[in-house]
Regions:
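Residue-level detector of structural "landmarks"
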Residues: 2-6, 15, 21
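Short, Lys/Arg-enriched N-terminal segments with co-localized hydrophobic residues
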Residues: 18-39
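Sec-dependent N-terminal signal peptides
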Residues: 43-51
Length: 736
């Protein structure tokens, strides 16, 4: 039959059932008076019957019940009709989740090319991924490795970095579906034991187990309800941070209050653990205690009330020694990175918005000497190597630059020449002459190098062998003016020889918060999109840490709109310069980046074809009432701070700025049932309101994962399915 009608029908059916039926009816009407098309008419009648049957089988859109809940802020009434969705343990919420997932699954699983895309995602992810080797106190070397499609990376042990690795701890054996993740491992200072933390189903709640590092035997020690913790070894036990056991109904949504530090002695039950520190006067704080390798000093961290932290030191050589405060008022960041005898090396931004390294002593910890002073680039971290040098990791225009410094006088010795514009992280050890680092870029998978301090050369230690070739792609960095004229950087990755005719699909990604920097890094999940002709754009927004504390503060509290203006400016620049058009543009972000996407799609819905807010903070008036949301107040402010702050939050809160009768972009909201960082109620209420307000014909869906959390520790099998859904949704709704 003529004119490619089969392709038109397939496209209409994939878009939505209504379009499918309308297309068949229109086609039949066009041909009904032409007898030469009798066979076509019969075919169309059969297709119409099939379409009606197809429509009857499809799940109906969810109509969410509304109630009359209203909150009053400074005399202003704010309705919250979907408040009941905050109860994640109710049967009604569970039924709503099931109904929404049924609609979403029906749509996603029928997208043209999804299965082909999933197959390609598995192919490009199936290569050996290796971490940076590290040397432990028992003389052994350890390395994380994933053979390709393992759900979780495995910890291996070696006699030397060149030795054949032997499995030391395989988290894939801890669950059948890969949803138990290894979060951290901590060797005792004599090398005899290793404590490790795990999380289940992506939750922030942690459990601690202990194994004999020599025999790999699992000991009976087991700690529950730990959170945001390490295991700080001292003597024959370790310190850890935990909360009281929560109520069963709200373990994943209730406010976390009263963080405490305990000491656990090996071979005893958790019920015998000794309470080491608590502060009932300040329940909305985090506390953590760390111990140096020599077990001569302990450091107490306190944070949560402002953008920085308080730091205290305790001399463990003296019985009942007091905590001595090093920093106060929580206005700045400060933490120890190394100790040597009486010396303490502190990384801080006190009087240094771009960060610096100072040295002090345990005898007089309030007197500091600048060792690596503040520079015009952001100091991201330091690594001590041999007895005399420090590797300083800097960020310049969001990519890594590294320099070697003399530890004794702070003199800059030389630059470490990295393979290109990308990101690098270093592992070295005081007193040892080796340094390994990982390097990646948008087109270079993570590669491990050995850096020779004597020659200054970088030697490849482990380089991945992949099933794809990215030599035909390139990355450029551009700068554009935001609404107020601020110069904003953005990385673009695409096929070489691209035409700037406005026809290219773009995946625009951003974050913009909490002093977190977005640097060039590799993800195999982007490869099929790039291969299909898409452009990956990553923009460095204010609120992040790319240019120091001033850049961060420019995107917080009453300056938060700057972040959204930067992101909107990136979209407008890409369109104005011929990279794409509104019909080809997708915006994506997670967590604080989900807030970003939610705010930008409500402020400029016509600017984008697709929006994917992932695990986003959508209710800016109530976010601080769930789990650890109170900890975000230094960046956001709260609706209870002042009337001015309330009105500012109300002005951009994604949930409260969805307008009835508005045509929104094709939207896929994502969340998960065990997300106790940004509770799923944010996404639930946003999706329900979006579906109510949308007047356009583009899909408004929510994808609610099970046995998953905020993203950390998610098994690869789940990641692949999720990315297949997201990318196929984006590609279909941008015409790829």
């Amino acid at each position: 039959m003529p004119w490619g009608w089969q392709e038109k029908i397939a496209s209409a059916a994939a878009q939505d059932r209504k379009n499918f039926i309308v297309f068949i009816l229109q086609s039949y009407n066009n041909y009904r008076n032409f007898t030469i098309f009798g066979n076509m008419k019969r075919s169309l009648i059969l297709l119409l019957m099939a379409a009606i049957a197809f429509d009857a089988c499809a799940p109906k859109p969810v109509v969410t019940r509304k109630d009359n809940t209203v909150d009053t802020y400074f005399g202003t009434e704010v309705p919250d009709p979907y408040r009941w969705l905050e109860d994640d343990s109710s049967e009604e919420t569970a039924a709503w989740v099931k109904a929404q997932n049924k609609v979403t699954d029906y749509y996603l699983k029928r997208l043209p090319g999804r299965e082909k895309l999933l197959k390609r995602l598995k192919e490009v992810a199936n290569y050996e991924k290796v971490g940076v080797p590290f040397h432990e106190k028992n003389g052994k070397w350890y390395i994380y490795k994933n053979n390709g499609l393992q759900n979780q990376s495995v910890l291996y042990e070696m006699e030397s970095p060149e030795d054949v690795p032997v499995v030391f701890l395989d988290p894939n054996t801890l669950s059948e579906d890969g949803t138990v993740a290894l979060k951290g491992c901590y060797f005792s200072n004599d090398g005899r034991y290793m404590a490790y933390t795990i999380s289940r189903s992506g939750s922030d709640w942690e459990e601690i187990y202990v194994m004999d590092a020599r025999t790999k035997e699992l000991l009976p020690d087991h700690i529950e309800w730990a959170k945001f913790t390490e295991a700080a070894w001292c003597g024959d036990g370790f310190y850890y941070s935990a909360y009281d056991r929560p109520g069963e109904d709200h373990a994943y949504s209730g406010k976390n209050e009263g963080h405490k530090i305990y000491y656990h002695k090996i071979g005893t039950p958790q019920s015998d653990d000794v309470l080491f520190f608590e502060n009932p006067a300040e329940p909305l704080r985090f506390y953590q205690f760390t111990v140096n390798e020599a077990e001569t000093m302990g450091f107490l961290y306190e944070d949560g009330a402002d953008i920085g932290n308080n730091l205290y030191v305790k001399d463990l050589r003296k019985a009942d020694s007091p905590f001595v405060q090093i920093t106060r008022d929580m206005k700045n960041a400060c933490y120890p990175v190394e100790t040597d005898g009486e010396l303490i090396y502190l990384f801080t931004n006190v009087d240094a918005p771009m960060n610096k390294l100072v040295v002090t002593t345990i005898g007089n910890p309030k007197v500091w000497k600048d060792l690596i002073p503040e520079w015009d680039c952001v100091l991201n971290g330091v690594s001590f190597i041999t007895d005399g040098f420090i590797i300083a990791n800097y960020s310049k225009d969001a990519s890594t630059h590294a320099y070697l410094y003399d530890r004794h006088d702070g003199r800059r010795v030389e630059e470490l020449h990295l393979p290109g514009v990308g990101s690098a992280s270093f592992i070295a050890k005081l007193g040892e002459p080796w340094c390994y680092y990982s390097y990646s870029s948008f087109t270079t998978p993570g590669t491990i190098y050995f850096w020779n301090i004597e020659t200054g050369d970088s030697i490849v230690y482990k380089q991945p062998k992949t099933a794809f070739d990215l030599s035909g792609f390139e990355t450029v960095q551009v700068f554009f003016p935001s609404k107020d004229g601020t110069r904003i950087p953005m990385f673009l990755t695409y096929k070489k020889g691209i035409k700037l005719d406005g026809s290219n699909p773009v995946y625009l990604y951003g974050y913009g918060g909490f002093d977190i920097s977005l640097s060039p890094s590799f993800s195999s999940m982007r490869v099929p999109y790039l291969e299909a002709g898409g452009i990956y754009a990553q923009v460095n927004l204010r609120g992040g840490g790319e240019y120091g504390e001033a850049w961060h503060l420019a995107g917080t509290k009453m300056n938060k709109q700057n972040v959204f203006d930067d992101f909107i400016g990136a979209a407008e620049w890409l369109i104005a310069n011929g990279y794409t058009s509104s019909e080809k543009l997708a915006i994506v972000g997670g967590s604080n980046g989900g807030l970003l996407v939610g705010a930008c799609m409500t402020q400029r819905p016509e600017l984008y074809a697709v929006a994917v807010p992932q695990v986003g903070v959508m209710d800016m008036l109530r976010y601080h009432k769930f789990t650890i949301g109170w900890n975000w107040a230094p960046d956001y402010g709260t609706s209870e701070d002042s009337e001015e702050m309330f009105r500012y939050l109300l002005g951009y809160s994604p949930l409260h700025n969805l307008k009835p009768g508005t045509a929104y972009p094709a939207t896929l909201v994502t969340t998960a049932d065990h997300d106790d960082r940004v509770v799923p109620a944010h996404s639930f209420k946003f999706a329900a309101t979006l579906q109510e307000c949308n007047s356009g014909d583009k899909p408004q869906l929510i994808r609610i994962d099970s046995k998953a959390g905020h993203g950390g520790g998610k098994p690869l099998a789940k990641v692949l399915e999720e990315q297949a859904d997201i990318y196929s949704f984006i590609m279909h709704n941008t015409g790829m």
